[in-house]
Amino acid sequence: MKVQPVLVNKDNYSYLVIDEKNKVAIAIDPCEPNKVISSLSSISSDIKINSVFTTHHHWDHAGGNNLIKTIIKDINVYGRDERFEGITKKLENNEVLKIGSLKIKTLDAPAHTSSHVLYLIEDENEPNQVKSLFTGDTLFIGGCGRLFEGNPEQMYNALYNVIGKLPDNTLVYVGHEYTLKNLEFAKTLESENENKELYNFYDQCKEKLANGEFTVPSSIAQEKLINPFMRCHLPSIYNHYLKENPNSINPPSPIDVLGFIRSLKDKF
Protein backbone atom coordinates (compact mmCIF):
# COMPACT_ATOMS: atom_id res chain seq x y z
CA MET A 1 0.00 0.00 0.00
CA LYS A 2 1.30 3.39 -0.98
CA VAL A 3 -0.13 6.74 0.16
CA GLN A 4 0.39 9.74 -2.11
CA PRO A 5 -0.61 13.17 -0.76
CA VAL A 6 -1.89 15.65 -3.33
CA LEU A 7 -1.97 19.33 -2.34
CA VAL A 8 -5.11 20.95 -3.74
CA ASN A 9 -7.00 24.21 -3.25
CA LYS A 10 -3.88 25.90 -1.82
CA ASP A 11 -3.74 24.10 1.54
CA ASN A 12 -6.04 21.06 1.30
CA TYR A 13 -4.73 17.53 1.24
CA SER A 14 -6.32 14.94 -1.01
CA TYR A 15 -4.84 11.46 -0.97
CA LEU A 16 -4.35 8.52 -3.26
CA VAL A 17 -4.17 5.17 -1.49
CA ILE A 18 -2.69 2.73 -3.96
CA ASP A 19 -2.77 -1.06 -4.07
CA GLU A 20 0.09 -1.58 -6.49
CA LYS A 21 -0.30 -5.36 -6.67
CA ASN A 22 -3.93 -5.22 -7.79
CA LYS A 23 -3.43 -1.96 -9.73
CA VAL A 24 -6.26 -0.15 -8.02
CA ALA A 25 -6.42 3.11 -6.07
CA ILE A 26 -8.89 4.99 -3.94
CA ALA A 27 -9.05 8.76 -3.57
CA ILE A 28 -9.66 10.52 -0.26
CA ASP A 29 -11.38 13.94 -0.51
CA PRO A 30 -10.43 14.66 -4.16
CA CYS A 31 -11.85 18.18 -4.32
CA GLU A 32 -9.78 18.86 -7.46
CA PRO A 33 -10.16 15.59 -9.37
CA ASN A 34 -7.94 16.50 -12.30
CA LYS A 35 -4.98 17.17 -10.01
CA VAL A 36 -5.54 13.87 -8.22
CA ILE A 37 -5.86 11.91 -11.46
CA SER A 38 -2.77 13.61 -12.86
CA SER A 39 -0.82 12.70 -9.73
CA LEU A 40 -1.75 9.05 -10.17
CA SER A 41 -0.82 9.14 -13.85
CA SER A 42 2.65 10.37 -12.91
CA ILE A 43 3.06 7.30 -10.70
CA SER A 44 1.62 4.68 -13.07
CA SER A 45 -0.52 4.56 -16.18
CA ASP A 46 -1.76 1.08 -15.24
CA ILE A 47 -3.41 1.94 -11.91
CA LYS A 48 -6.98 3.21 -11.90
CA ILE A 49 -9.09 4.97 -9.26
CA ASN A 50 -12.24 3.00 -8.60
CA SER A 51 -13.57 4.65 -5.43
CA VAL A 52 -13.77 7.95 -3.58
CA PHE A 53 -13.99 8.18 0.21
CA THR A 54 -15.14 11.52 1.61
CA THR A 55 -14.54 12.60 5.22
CA HIS A 56 -17.24 15.28 5.43
CA HIS A 57 -19.58 17.38 3.32
CA HIS A 58 -17.69 20.70 3.15
CA TRP A 59 -16.99 21.82 -0.41
CA ASP A 60 -13.20 21.70 -0.04
CA HIS A 61 -13.44 17.98 0.66
CA ALA A 62 -16.57 16.77 -1.15
CA GLY A 63 -16.78 19.43 -3.87
CA GLY A 64 -15.07 17.33 -6.54
CA ASN A 65 -17.23 14.25 -6.22
CA ASN A 66 -19.69 15.03 -9.00
CA LEU A 67 -16.90 16.02 -11.37
CA ILE A 68 -14.87 12.87 -10.79
CA LYS A 69 -18.01 10.84 -11.53
CA THR A 70 -18.12 12.41 -15.00
CA ILE A 71 -14.43 11.67 -15.59
CA ILE A 72 -14.35 8.09 -14.28
CA LYS A 73 -17.49 6.18 -15.19
CA ASP A 74 -19.00 3.80 -12.61
CA ILE A 75 -16.77 5.13 -9.83
CA ASN A 76 -18.05 4.51 -6.31
CA VAL A 77 -18.36 7.55 -4.05
CA TYR A 78 -18.65 6.80 -0.33
CA GLY A 79 -19.76 9.11 2.47
CA ARG A 80 -21.76 9.25 5.69
CA ASP A 81 -24.99 11.06 4.73
CA GLU A 82 -26.88 12.78 1.93
CA ARG A 83 -25.00 16.05 2.42
CA PHE A 84 -21.88 14.44 0.94
CA GLU A 85 -21.87 15.54 -2.69
CA GLY A 86 -22.39 12.77 -5.23
CA ILE A 87 -22.30 9.78 -2.90
CA THR A 88 -23.38 6.44 -4.30
CA LYS A 89 -23.24 4.57 -0.99
CA LYS A 90 -23.84 5.67 2.57
CA LEU A 91 -21.42 4.19 5.09
CA GLU A 92 -22.14 3.22 8.69
CA ASN A 93 -19.92 3.54 11.74
CA ASN A 94 -17.36 0.70 11.92
CA GLU A 95 -18.32 -0.51 8.45
CA VAL A 96 -15.45 -2.24 6.66
CA LEU A 97 -15.00 -2.34 2.89
CA LYS A 98 -12.40 -4.23 0.90
CA ILE A 99 -11.02 -2.87 -2.36
CA GLY A 100 -8.25 -5.01 -3.78
CA SER A 101 -6.09 -5.78 -0.77
CA LEU A 102 -7.07 -2.54 0.97
CA LYS A 103 -9.29 -2.79 4.04
CA ILE A 104 -11.06 0.49 4.79
CA LYS A 105 -12.82 0.99 8.12
CA THR A 106 -15.18 3.91 8.71
CA LEU A 107 -15.04 5.58 12.13
CA ASP A 108 -17.62 8.16 13.17
CA ALA A 109 -16.10 11.38 14.54
CA PRO A 110 -18.83 14.02 14.78
CA ALA A 111 -17.55 17.41 16.02
CA HIS A 112 -16.27 19.54 13.14
CA THR A 113 -19.47 18.48 11.37
CA SER A 114 -22.21 16.22 12.67
CA SER A 115 -21.47 13.47 10.13
CA HIS A 116 -17.68 13.65 9.91
CA VAL A 117 -15.94 10.31 9.48
CA LEU A 118 -12.38 9.01 9.60
CA TYR A 119 -10.97 6.22 7.46
CA LEU A 120 -8.59 3.64 8.91
CA ILE A 121 -6.86 1.78 6.09
CA GLU A 122 -4.55 -1.21 6.01
CA ASP A 123 -3.23 -3.58 3.35
CA GLU A 124 -4.16 -7.19 4.00
CA ASN A 125 -1.22 -8.35 1.88
CA GLU A 126 1.16 -6.49 4.19
CA PRO A 127 0.17 -7.57 7.73
CA ASN A 128 3.23 -5.95 9.30
CA GLN A 129 2.61 -2.57 7.70
CA VAL A 130 1.49 0.27 9.95
CA LYS A 131 -2.15 1.33 9.51
CA SER A 132 -3.01 4.75 8.12
CA LEU A 133 -5.72 7.06 9.45
CA PHE A 134 -7.26 9.77 7.29
CA THR A 135 -8.69 12.39 9.61
CA GLY A 136 -10.16 15.11 7.37
CA ASP A 137 -10.83 18.16 9.53
CA THR A 138 -11.11 16.35 12.87
CA LEU A 139 -7.43 16.02 13.76
CA PHE A 140 -4.73 18.21 12.25
CA ILE A 141 -1.02 17.99 12.92
CA GLY A 142 -0.77 19.95 16.16
CA GLY A 143 -4.45 20.93 16.15
CA CYS A 144 -8.08 20.02 15.59
CA GLY A 145 -10.97 21.30 13.51
CA ARG A 146 -13.33 24.09 14.42
CA LEU A 147 -16.56 23.03 16.09
CA PHE A 148 -18.99 24.11 13.38
CA GLU A 149 -21.70 21.55 14.16
CA GLY A 150 -20.41 19.81 17.26
CA ASN A 151 -19.24 20.55 20.79
CA PRO A 152 -16.13 20.04 22.93
CA GLU A 153 -17.43 16.76 24.34
CA GLN A 154 -17.74 15.30 20.84
CA MET A 155 -14.28 16.49 19.83
CA TYR A 156 -12.83 15.08 23.05
CA ASN A 157 -14.47 11.75 22.27
CA ALA A 158 -13.09 11.78 18.73
CA LEU A 159 -9.55 12.66 19.81
CA TYR A 160 -9.28 10.61 22.98
CA ASN A 161 -11.68 7.68 22.60
CA VAL A 162 -11.63 7.07 18.85
CA ILE A 163 -8.25 8.28 17.57
CA GLY A 164 -6.37 8.11 20.85
CA LYS A 165 -7.17 4.43 21.39
CA LEU A 166 -5.74 3.32 18.06
CA PRO A 167 -2.16 1.98 18.07
CA ASP A 168 0.34 4.77 18.71
CA ASN A 169 2.27 3.94 15.54
CA THR A 170 -0.78 4.57 13.34
CA LEU A 171 0.12 7.10 10.65
CA VAL A 172 -2.01 10.24 10.52
CA TYR A 173 -2.94 11.94 7.24
CA VAL A 174 -4.81 15.20 7.82
CA GLY A 175 -7.09 17.34 5.67
CA HIS A 176 -5.12 20.62 5.60
CA GLU A 177 -1.56 21.90 5.70
CA TYR A 178 -2.09 23.97 8.85
CA THR A 179 0.89 22.52 10.68
CA LEU A 180 3.08 25.53 11.39
CA LYS A 181 0.19 27.76 12.45
CA ASN A 182 -1.09 25.03 14.77
CA LEU A 183 2.33 24.50 16.31
CA GLU A 184 2.82 28.24 16.76
CA PHE A 185 -0.39 28.25 18.79
CA ALA A 186 0.73 25.20 20.76
CA LYS A 187 3.95 27.03 21.64
CA THR A 188 1.89 29.78 23.31
CA LEU A 189 0.59 27.13 25.72
CA GLU A 190 3.74 25.17 26.50
CA SER A 191 7.23 26.59 26.94
CA GLU A 192 10.31 24.87 25.57
CA ASN A 193 11.14 23.72 29.09
CA GLU A 194 7.69 22.15 29.40
CA ASN A 195 7.68 20.46 25.99
CA LYS A 196 11.02 20.23 24.20
CA GLU A 197 9.52 17.79 21.68
CA LEU A 198 7.03 20.42 20.49
CA TYR A 199 9.79 22.90 19.69
CA ASN A 200 11.96 20.30 17.97
CA PHE A 201 9.01 19.12 15.91
CA TYR A 202 8.17 22.68 14.89
CA ASP A 203 11.71 23.13 13.56
CA GLN A 204 11.51 19.83 11.67
CA CYS A 205 8.19 20.77 10.04
CA LYS A 206 9.43 24.24 9.14
CA GLU A 207 12.45 22.70 7.42
CA LYS A 208 10.27 20.21 5.53
CA LEU A 209 8.05 22.95 4.15
CA ALA A 210 11.06 25.08 3.22
CA ASN A 211 12.35 22.10 1.23
CA GLY A 212 9.04 21.68 -0.59
CA GLU A 213 8.10 18.57 1.39
CA PHE A 214 4.81 17.65 3.06
CA THR A 215 4.47 17.59 6.84
CA VAL A 216 2.25 14.50 6.59
CA PRO A 217 2.21 11.89 7.83
CA SER A 218 2.29 12.41 11.55
CA SER A 219 1.47 9.60 13.97
CA ILE A 220 -0.82 9.20 16.92
CA ALA A 221 2.22 8.93 19.19
CA GLN A 222 3.56 12.21 17.80
CA GLU A 223 0.24 13.99 18.29
CA LYS A 224 0.07 12.89 21.90
CA LEU A 225 3.43 14.59 22.41
CA ILE A 226 2.83 17.90 20.63
CA ASN A 227 -0.90 18.48 20.04
CA PRO A 228 -2.50 20.53 22.83
CA PHE A 229 -5.95 19.14 22.03
CA MET A 230 -4.67 15.66 22.88
CA ARG A 231 -2.91 16.95 26.01
CA CYS A 232 -5.87 18.53 27.82
CA HIS A 233 -5.33 16.21 30.79
CA LEU A 234 -1.83 17.59 31.47
CA PRO A 235 -1.05 20.48 33.86
CA SER A 236 0.96 22.40 31.27
CA ILE A 237 -2.25 22.72 29.24
CA TYR A 238 -5.02 22.79 31.82
CA ASN A 239 -3.29 25.41 34.00
CA HIS A 240 -4.28 27.97 31.34
CA TYR A 241 -7.90 27.03 31.95
CA LEU A 242 -7.47 27.24 35.72
CA LYS A 243 -6.06 30.77 35.47
CA GLU A 244 -9.28 31.89 33.81
CA ASN A 245 -11.51 29.66 35.93
CA PRO A 246 -9.99 29.72 39.44
CA ASN A 247 -13.10 28.23 41.05
CA SER A 248 -12.97 25.13 38.87
CA ILE A 249 -12.18 21.72 40.28
CA ASN A 250 -8.50 20.84 40.05
CA PRO A 251 -7.69 19.03 37.86
CA PRO A 252 -10.50 20.32 35.64
CA SER A 253 -12.51 18.31 33.16
CA PRO A 254 -10.40 17.78 30.02
CA ILE A 255 -13.56 18.41 28.00
CA ASP A 256 -13.83 21.89 29.50
CA VAL A 257 -10.14 22.45 28.87
CA LEU A 258 -10.49 21.39 25.24
CA GLY A 259 -13.39 23.79 24.74
CA PHE A 260 -11.38 26.58 26.33
CA ILE A 261 -8.26 26.13 24.22
CA ARG A 262 -10.39 25.68 21.10
CA SER A 263 -11.89 29.11 21.79
CA LEU A 264 -8.37 30.51 22.18
CA LYS A 265 -7.32 28.94 18.89
CA ASP A 266 -10.38 30.40 17.13
CA LYS A 267 -9.00 33.86 17.95
CA PHE A 268 -5.33 33.08 17.33
UniProtKB/Swiss-Prot annotation:
InterPro entries: Clx_II_MBL, HAGH_C, Hydroxyacylglutathione_Hdrlase, Metallo-B-lactamas, RibonucZ/Hydroxyglut_hydro. Zn(2+) 1 binds at residues 56, 58, 112, 137. Pathway: Secondary metabolite metabolism; methylglyoxal degradation; (R)-lactate from methylglyoxal: step 2/2. Keywords: Hydrolase, Metal-binding, Zinc. Substrate binds at residues 176-178. Its cofactor is Zn(2+). Zn(2+) 2 binds at residues 60-61, 137, 176. It comes from the Eukaryota. Binds 2 Zn(2+) ions per subunit. The keyword DNA repair does not apply. One of its GO terms (molecular function) is hydroxyacylglutathione hydrolase activity. It holds the Pfam family HAGH_C. Monomer. Thiolesterase that catalyzes the hydrolysis of S-D-lactoyl-glutathione to form glutathione and D-lactic acid. Belongs to the metallo-beta-lactamase superfamily. Glyoxalase II family. This is Hydroxyacylglutathione hydrolase. It comes from Dictyostelium discoideum (Social amoeba).
